[in-house]
Curated annotation (Swiss-Prot):
InterPro entries: Rota_NS35_C, Rota_NS35_N, Rotavirus_NSP2, Rotavirus_NSP2_C, Rotavirus_NSP2_N. Keywords: ATP-binding, Host cytoplasm, Hydrolase, Magnesium, Metal-binding, Nucleotide-binding, RNA-binding. Its EC number is 3.6.4.-. It comes from Rotavirus A (strain RVA/Pig/United States/OSU/1977/G5P9[7]) (RV-A). The keyword Chloroplast does not apply. This is Non-structural protein 2.
Length: 317
């Protein structure tokens, strides 16, 4: 995750802003600079290489002292920064909005995936600039629309029916912020269209998840799509979701947290997010993740959760 101010800076033109991507040498210069505390939140002028990000975001970049940041000296950083600027320059951002826009925290991996989709000649985003910009505006929180299959971050499609598409995420292969844990495996489920879904389509998806992905929990980060994650990573997702929800509420970026379909979401996660929306503390909410829930009546007749051991999926082992 990183603020948009880590990728570009605003230049005032008449009554709105044009956004310009940073170059890696300007960032490198900022990372070595001694900057007064009162200027930590201001864009840094490298004199030689142009404007650089505010020094308060130093930890967002990979250095000898910090291996958890972005690999900003890669060509992928330039591609992501340019894509963000193209999207922001396609809309009007006024003086009253610019600080709020640049402080927004976005998923770096999501944006890298959109670059990969843009470069894939077989992908619809390669052929439609309009759809590509729409996908980026959704990714950076500048659009109220949800991420549907056409505008999704992408990955490898492992399941699809008339209503849903399930993607295996490919973060292990990334250049900007690759996941280094070789055991990482995670999926995302997007809606093909943002419209009511038939029970038959939901039943098909639930059957697929119970049969093939029973070692995973189906959760949501509240943005209109599902995530299918290992049970061992659920607590980590809970910390991130709670922190983001609270930060958004604090900064005034209040968006409705979409709980999605209770028949698909893991029961304990639904309880956690419902409790979070009610204003409870993280500790109170997280207890619900590890609590034995009363089994709800199966909403789909004839769809059993009981499996013999030799029938259980080996995905995720």
């Amino acid at each position: 995750m990183a603020e948009l101010a880590c990728f570009c800076y605003p230049h005032l033109e008449k009554d709105s802003y044009k956004f310009i991507p940073f170059n890696s040498l300007a960032i490198k210069c900022m990372l070595t600079a001694k900057v007064d505390k009162k200027d930590q939140d201001k864009f840094y002028n490298s004199i030689v290489y142009g404007i650089a990000p505010p020094p308060q975001f130093k930890k967002r970049y990979n250095t000898n002292d910090n291996s958890r940041g972005m690999n900003f000296e890669t060509s992928m950083f330039n591609k992501v920064a340019i894509l963000i600027c193209e999207a922001l320059n396609s809309i009007k951002v006024t003086q009253s909005d610019v600080a709020n826009v640049l402080s927004r925290v976005v998923s770096v991996r999501h944006l890298e995936n959109l670059v990969l989709r843009k470069e894939n000649h077989q992908d619809v985003l390669f052929h439609s600039k309009e759809l590509l910009l729409k996908a980026v505006l959704i990714a950076i929180g500048q659009s109220k629309e949800i991420e549907t299959t056409a505008t999704a971050e992408g990955g490898e499609i492992v399941f699809q029916n008339a209503a849903f598409t399930m993607w295996k995420l490919t973060y292990l292969d990334h250049k900007l912020m690759p996941i280094l844990d070789q055991n990482f495996i995670e999926y995302k489920i997007t809606l093909n269209e943002d419209k009511p879904i038939s029970d038959a389509c939901v039943k098909e998806l639930v059957a697929e998840l119970r049969w093939q992905y029973n070692r995973f929990a189906v959760i949501t980060h509240g943005k209109g799509h599902y995530r299918v994650v290992k049970y061992s990573s659920v607590a980590n997702h809970a910390d991130r979701v709670f922190a983001t929800y609270k930060n958004n509420a604090k900064s005034g970026n209040v968006t409705d947290f979409n709980l999605l379909d209770q028949r698909i979401i893991w029961q304990n996660w639904y309880a956690f997010t419902s409790s979070m929306k009610q204003g409870n503390t993280l500790d109170v909410c997280k207890k619900l993740l590890f609590q034995k829930m009363k089994q709800e009546k199966n909403p789909f007749k004839g769809l059993s959760t009981d499996r013999k051991m030799d029938e259980v999926s080996h995905v995720g082992i």
